[in-house]
Amino acid sequence: MAKSSREKIKLISSSGSKHYYTTTKNKKAPSKKIELKKYDPKIRKHVLYKEAKIK
């Protein structure tokens, strides 16, 4: 099987609710850490999510 060109990452909520989303990111493209505004169902608001590595 071929090696994937995408890296799995975790987007962690900045609200402190410990909620996270998982997604993939292109390994080869030079980029900064991802920061997205997404919905946090635990606090029922849109908050900033920051990229973190999956352990």
Swiss-Prot record:
GO terms for biological process: translation. Keywords: Ribonucleoprotein, Ribosomal protein. The lineage of its organism: Bacteria, Pseudomonadati, Pseudomonadota, Gammaproteobacteria, Enterobacterales. This is Large ribosomal subunit protein bL33. It comes from Buchnera aphidicola subsp. Baizongia pistaciae (strain Bp). Gene3D superfamilies: Ribosomal protein L33 (2.20.28.120). NCBIfam families: PRK00595.1, rpmG_bact. The keyword NAD does not apply. HAMAP family: Ribosomal_bL33. One of its GO terms (cellular component) is cytosolic large ribosomal subunit. It comes from the Bacteria. InterPro entries: Ribosomal_bL33, Ribosomal_bL33_CS, Ribosomal_bL33_sf, Ribosomal_zn-bd. Belongs to the bacterial ribosomal protein bL33 family. GO terms for molecular function: structural constituent of ribosome.
